[in-house]
Amino acid sequence: MAERILKNISSRGLKNALRGNDYRKEASISYGILLGGYIVFQILTTAGLIGHNLQGQFVPICVYVSLAISLNLVVGISGELSLGHAGFMAVGAFSGILMSRILGQSMSFEPAIIIISMLFGALIASLAGFVIGIPILGLRGDYLAIVTLAFGEIIRNFMNVLYFGFDSNGRLRFAFNHTIDDVANNDRIITGAIGATGTKTMATFTWGLLLCLFTVFVVLNLKNSKQGRAIMSIRDNRIAGESIGLDVRKYKLMAFVVSAALAGMAGCLFGLNYSTLVPVKFNFNTSVLILVFVVLGGVGNIWGGIIAAALLTVLPETFRQFSDYRMLTYAIVLILVMICTYNPAIKARITGVWTKINPFKNRSGGKGKGKKRKSRKEAA
């Protein structure tokens, strides 16, 4: 009996060690890609090998990388399909711009303004995620996707009629009409469909890198925590999770809110990268674009999403003459990915190739299985 207990303890220790080893590998690859890409881009920029137009895409690349990672938390780790990620991005963008303009009245230290604005954008976006998540997370599959899509469109249309500005006394005022009484044009922050104008551009490539590193840190630590394992167990078998007492709604809401907060931070940095930002920028196509990053990078694969987001943000700028066909190309690629995923023959072939090149492949997996079979025979 004692020998069997010791074997169980040692097998659990081995599983925990392997899980920790996988975490370290995934974290090392993700951080390595981000830091390596940052260094390479900086060297190429210093050498004058990157044009001005492509340099202007550095911050959007980082923003989309962060959005892909945060959406992976819902789609890959939680196993739910969300089509409203651009809505949380919009909430964070306009909230962050509003806070930056308020802080700019009395503060000139830009790093503090950026950090506070991003935290404020994350807070408002997480509140939106919490309010939206409570009633809708009882839904599953296509129904949840449709509701999140509707949420994204509601947010965009809400921004089209929202007006913020300072009055003659310096007080912040808002309205849901075409004019704000006693607010001069140069004191308006958000002007309905015209969007936010006069924003001081403070976002830089370095801030984008820090955002990506923070997003990877949060998602990987949540994924490998006790709560993350509960979320993934519910994803794999909801009924089994409920049967052992897991609060399904609580854990799904946790993933949804954290994902919304990270999207809000990314949206804030995106807003601080432009002097003018319009609500139409956060339409349905943006949500689909982020989902494309996740699917092409591999659902649940953090570093794959990083590569996909970076490449698909750079390529339209590189092949600008074909930019009109971008969404058509993404749609075709998505269809091909779905066909390859659900076709047994193609899937088996891809799985065979991936098994050979998988950096997370457990080389001792076969030995472990052999030991397990041997121990069962001894026990019998």
Label the model's feature ranges:
Residues 2-380:
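Transmembrane alpha-helices and adjacent helix-loop boundaries
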